[in-house]
Amino acid sequence: ISGYGQNGPYRLKAGHDLNYLAYTGVLHSTGSIDTPIAPLPQISDYAGALQATTAILAALLRAKLSRSGAYLDISLADTVLSWQSHALTSMTRSGYSFSRGNGNESGGCADYHIYQTADAKFVSLAAQESMFWENFCSAVGHQEWISRQRESVPQVSLINEVTRLFASQPLSHWCDLLDSIDCCFEPVLETTDIISHPQVIARHLLSKNDWPDPLVQVLRPSWIDDSAPKPRLAPKYCGVSAVKTAWDAKSS
């Protein structure tokens, strides 16, 4: 696994996640019109690990079937570039934009946008399908917005109207109003809110351990045979002297 792969003019170039996102155009479509943002978590680090896992599994299958090994060249930048397939294959489509703050899914549409509430909190609205948009507009008492969903992008006027609506009430008001409405609405949670979220609890995604140095474990995000992921056991604690003694004994 490397940043830019084992060949090409960048093969010896150093980099980190932000560099790979810049090189692949991700930062061009992420953030506000004024400036890109540095996303967190680091996209290429996790994407590259997943790509490596997929490639390793494929190589293991090939080894089992053909008794032939494989040399795997995984590039973090390549992996992020592959995640840009939608943007890259849509570049020639008339009227489709991925530019920062102006694209269909990068801030240019009112039905797929982040809005601020009266108490300086934020909500996400992703009512891209007409049924979700209609449900949202009806719930907030603005049926006149329904027919405007497909206005040309960027939808500056419509976005401003929806922005004023959300800014008129605190987050609790919008959660009470829209949580039960099928309109793809979700408040932007703070990290401390995630631990107690009922969906996270139901999915057994986190675990508070009883290690000497307690922390919250993020568990495997998959259920297998209807079984929830299980917490990992605490590593065995060993003092430095004990480790050195064991190491010396093994080396002798």
Regions found by a protein language model. Give the residues of each.
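A structural signal for well-ordered alpha-helical segments within the folded catalytic domains
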Residues: 47-54, 131-134, 172, 241
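Residue-level signal for nonpolar/aromatic packing positions in well-ordered secondary structure
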Residues: 17, 56, 67, 136, ...
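Aromatic-enriched alpha-helical interface/lid elements that frame and gate functional surfaces
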Residues: 111-181, 185, 247
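Active-site-adjacent "lid/gating" segments in soluble enzymes
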Residues: 1-123, 127
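Short coil/turn segments at secondary-structure boundaries
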Residues: 103, 175-180, 210-211, 236
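Short linear loop/turn motifs
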Residues: 147-163, 188-198, 212-216, 252
